[in-house]
Amino acid sequence: MEERNEQVVEEVKEAQVEEAVTPENSEETVEEKSEAALLQEKVDELQAKLTETEGRTLRLQADFENYKRRVQMDKQAAEKYRAQSLVSDILPALDNFERAMQVEATDEQTKSLLQGMEMVHRQLLEALTKEGVEVIEAVGKQFDPNEHQAIMQVEDSEFESNAVVEEFQKGYKLKDRVIRPSMVKVNQ
């Protein structure tokens, strides 16, 4: 009986070996490997798409943050320079006040009128100063093309080269932005 058991065990082992080597099993193994390779390709493809999508998402987030920052800066600039158009409109009237105040008063009534104009002029300047408007200094300063507009050149030994000799029209700045440059005569 032991012999018979040994024989049955050997037959089972041979059957298992034959089963493992049969063409059907080898096809299944190839199919499993092919299926595994296809699944791996699909995983790799999905990983690439995920990486691309993550990159695109990060770029969109960065673009949105830049947009928010730009909008905030534009809003701050609009708030900072909100009075620019009003100031630009008032400057010619201010110039006319200054020209009118240069007239010499001969009688008391004219002197009184000039005093009233000077008070209004001073109040206008104070209101503009509160908004951040300042007069651009010109005479005796070095010519700065950002703040001055040269309309004449002269040679004057009393002034340095490239210095402003005379101012024909005052220039104004609103905070750090030039509203109107000074019209000046510059030494060569």
From Swiss-Prot:
The keyword Cytoplasm applies. The keyword ATP-binding does not apply. GO terms for biological process: protein folding. GO terms for molecular function: adenyl-nucleotide exchange factor activity; protein homodimerization activity; protein-folding chaperone binding; unfolded protein binding. Residues 1-31 are annotated as: Disordered. Transmembrane segments: none annotated. It is found in: Cytoplasm. One of its GO terms (cellular component) is cytoplasm. Residues 1-16 have a biased composition (Basic and acidic residues). Keywords: Chaperone, Cytoplasm, Stress response. Participates actively in the response to hyperosmotic and heat shock by preventing the aggregation of stress-denatured proteins, in association with DnaK and GrpE. It is the nucleotide exchange factor for DnaK and may function as a thermosensor. Unfolded proteins bind initially to DnaJ; upon interaction with the DnaJ-bound protein, DnaK hydrolyzes its bound ATP, resulting in the formation of a stable complex. GrpE releases ADP from DnaK; ATP binding to DnaK triggers the release of the substrate protein, thus completing the reaction cycle. NCBIfam families: PRK14140.1 (NF010738). Belongs to the GrpE family. Homodimer. This is Protein GrpE.
